[in-house]
Amino acid sequence: MANSSPVYDWFQERLEIQDIADDVTSKYVPPHVNIFYCLGGITLVCFLIQFATGFAMTFYYKPTVTEAYSSVSYLMTDVSFGWLIRSVHRWSASMMVLMLILHVFRVYLTGGFKRPRELTWVTGVVMAVITVAFGVTGYSLPWDQVGYWAVKIVSGVPAAIPVVGDFMVELLRGGESVGQTTLTRFYSLHTFVLPWTLAVFMLMHFLMIRKQGISGPL
């Protein structure tokens, strides 16, 4: 590379970063691609906003049935820009779901799920399910009336499943009734299990897209 800096030369010698840059910038983009093909990327941006704002809120949120609601109220009223952080978190959550739905429709209508991209579609469906789980678990964390009854209803749904239904309900609730253990489990799922699971499937999804490229027009 002409007129390269010593810092660039140092990294280039060890990591060959120019090859990576060339691969990224020279990837072929089909001429039929339009703005609707950006919906998946917008969904990713929403997730990153969720991750950042959610991480910020963990500094103040207390996952106990006695302090959860008051800690959220404290965040909204006393913490500098706390109201903005939580509001952005909620808005981007809604936007993420909307962009995900539109992205799924775009992929389906343009045949992006067909051979050889079946696994890309499968990972996308898994991520859609995880996103719904994000909404369910996050809705409960303020532990207000809406959150409590939402948890009680959602965690009771598996009871209709034959044989394993009661076991699944108890597994979700951490006992026979909704309480502290339930909130702890939902908090753990929302802040640790689901984000990292989604990140793994996102990586798989993007690597497959990178390998196979964007599907052609109908």
Swiss-Prot record:
One of its GO terms (biological process) is photosynthesis. It is a multi-pass membrane protein. Binds 2 heme b groups non-covalently with two histidine residues as axial ligands. Heme c binds at residue 38. InterPro entries: Cyt_b/b6_N (IPR005797), Cyt_B6_PetB (IPR023530), Cytb/b6-like_sf (IPR027387), Cytochrome_b_N_euk/bac (IPR048259), Di-haem_cyt_TM (IPR016174). One of its GO terms (cellular component) is plasma membrane-derived thylakoid membrane. Pfam families: Cytochrome_B. GO terms for molecular function: electron transporter, transferring electrons within cytochrome b6/f complex of photosystem II activity; metal ion binding; oxidoreductase activity. Keywords: Electron transport, Heme, Iron, Membrane, Metal-binding, Photosynthesis, Thylakoid, Transmembrane, Transmembrane helix, Transport. It is found in: Cellular thylakoid membrane. Heme b 2 binds at residues 89, 190. NCBIfam families: PRK03735.1. The 4 large subunits of the cytochrome b6-f complex are cytochrome b6, subunit IV (17 kDa polypeptide, PetD), cytochrome f and the Rieske protein, while the 4 small subunits are PetG, PetL, PetM and PetN. The complex functions as a dimer. Belongs to the cytochrome b family. PetB subfamily. Component of the cytochrome b6-f complex, which mediates electron transfer between photosystem II (PSII) and photosystem I (PSI), cyclic electron flow around PSI, and state transitions. This is Cytochrome b6. It comes from Prochlorococcus marinus (strain MIT 9211). The lineage of its organism: Bacteria, Bacillati, Cyanobacteriota, Cyanophyceae, Synechococcales. The gene is petB.
